[in-house]
Amino acid sequence: MSADVTEGSDRCPSGVYLKCWYNSLTLARSVDGGRTFGQPPAPRHLIAAVPYRYQPDVGPVGLFQPSNVVRRSDDGHWYALVHAQAFGAQREGTCVMRTADLRDPGSWRAWDGSAYRVRFANPYESSGTGGRICAPVSFAEIAGMTHSLTYNTYLDEYVLVGPSSRPGHGRRGVVHGFYYSTSDDLIDWTPRKLIREVTLPTSFECGDPNPAYFPSLLDPDSPSRNFETTGQRPYLYFTRYHFKDCHSTLNRDLVRVRVRFSR
């Protein structure tokens, strides 16, 4: 991921970081087991971007929060989810993208509503939106969830986990927390269900419990090198923040909790 922000300059007259956030997806490769990463020279490192050039004080704009990458055994492609912010012709939600060659950043194609035909382009090298806008999937069911994607061998389905919210029952207001959804094709998802109710950084109000974020399902017993699979009893990992005087600090904990799926 990349974000070009210069606060308080002519690139961001307001000096407000979020309003001047433009995000795209880029390729980084490691040849030493993840110790270090390198990128092809720009712009050949670009994987995906919205077909609009940067504009100050209209953000955040772009493609955000990519999931981990999983390989489907039935077609040999590698898949990932990405959150698209609403801007121009781009609708907000979760987009699905795939490639047959992880080494080629230009080989990724996104779902357009009926097939994987969206070919991302560098907005500084070309113009127009035709064939360059991804179609969000199952918005009512998963909203913009993308954080953690695994194939669950117990459920025999893909499992998506992410921070979200839903209206509560009875007199309860909105319920914030970590939710999950399942799918057999990465396009059609079940209505998200609550795993763990937590305060989110985006919903925090002074006096609330310390928030948590970045949920991921990981299974230490996964045979996948990149933990692409989970079983019946994986761990839910997440980051717990420690706020001070109602403001975020860099004091954060990595927490894990065992969860159990049932059919």
Regions found by a protein language model. Give the residues of each.
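Beta-propeller and closely related beta-sheet repeat lectin domains
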Residues: 65-68, 145-148, 205, 210-225
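Short linear interaction motifs
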Residues: 60-63
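Beta-rich carbohydrate-recognition and catalytic domains
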Residues: 1-57, 73-142, 151-206, 222-263
